[in-house]
Amino acid sequence: MAFDGQSKGRACIIGAGCSGFTMAKRLKDYGIPYDCFEMSDDIGGNWYFKNPNGLSSCYQSLHIDTSKWRLAFEDFPVPEDWPDFPHHAQLLQYFHDYVDHFGLRETITFNTAVETARRRDDGDWDVTLSTGETRTYQWLIVANGHHWDARVPDYPGEFDGYQVHSHHYRDPFEPFDFRGKRVMIVGGGNSAMDISSELSQRPIAEKLFISMRRGVWVLPKYMNGQPADKAVLPSWLPTKLGRKLARSAIKKRIGNMEDYGLPKPDHEPLDGHPSVSGEFLTRVGCGDIHPKGAIDKLDGDGVIFKDGTREKIDAIVWATGYNVSFPFFDTDDLRAKDNRFPLFKRMVKPGYENLFFLGLAQPLPTLVNFAEQQSKLCAAKIAGEYDFPPREEMEKVIVEDEKFHLGHFYDAPRHTMQVDFNAYVKDLMKELENGRKRAKATA
């Protein structure tokens, strides 16, 4: 049965992380037939520590920076005895409990990767698996994540010591022993905050530097005695005013970054993806972490910085982000350019209305239950309950949405997919309602 834009057909889900299995649950609820392929031996994706597929970026000490109050699935509450910020093992167990509670495990095909996905002339998708088999689907749902294809900047010179991207960092001792070493972390995101705080402890690194090309605002995990993300501004408050009030509260709470010896940010709080840490600023203030500016070049057993200074370095951890990649597509239309991949409601590329990207965003405060919301529109479309607007309108909405969600962020690869979770979901539900009206009008 070829894709005709209306008939249910069969769906293929690529990946069984939190985006993939919440989509599977939604399709199961609708009674829509689907296959879900996971290249690893179990669910969890990025939150599966030491995932045998090599694509997890979990390190042993990792706790999620989103509080339990904001990451719970709608119909499956988190355990009452959880701490405010659960460890990755607790989050993974929550995922397992969800999958087993809703009977999803038997619907997932493990140890099977999607090698290629090609759109046919009739609109269907030919999906070739690592088993060598090719199957045809009317709907394709991509949930392969965007925190696995590590990006390492290219600097002149050579470095003779140990190098690792934060994606492959696991703990201070294995696979590399950082004890007694002069270590440099490169980057200013959450992984950089966590790993520098961990390795800077005196029994571990002899000396730890952090190199940032630009200053960032490091936000606390707690404000006024509660998780910072638990405080939600009233929904009636205009977005710009809410952002202004939040900025004022942040500055009052943490002061100026340069007062800690860090580079002065060239932007306001919340004009960049927040770096969140309850420990980093204290370790900088205690002299355990030594801030440095941008790298000029690598220099054998050391690094030369833009200000002309040089530091002897034994090991570098590159906490420099990720590329957005879809290795199973072979058409330029479906490749991200400079990490930019504009989509209608962060889900659909106009002209490919039977292809959905789930979880392909950097939502504040969390990605964990983001696709659970997206799956509502996706399933409604497959079930014939929702219709997209005309292509021209979809293109216009993409531009408007990107201006709304990205307009206040400084230009950087990490800011190509930012969305405000609450504003996004509110707008998505409005679009879902409008699309249902369109579907009824043409029925």
Task: Provide a role label for each language-model segment.
Residues 396-409:
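Short, mixed-charge aromatic SLiMs
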Residues 2-61, 77-216, 221-222, 235-391, ...:
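Flavin (primarily FAD) cofactor-binding/catalytic cores of flavoenzymes
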Residues 69-70:
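Aromatic- and acidic-residue-enriched carbohydrate-binding clefts of CAZyme catalytic domains
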Residues 232:
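Conformationally flexible catalytic loops at phosphate/diphosphate-handling active centers
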Residues 63-66:
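Flexible "cap/lid" subdomain of the alpha/beta-hydrolase fold that forms the substrate-access gate
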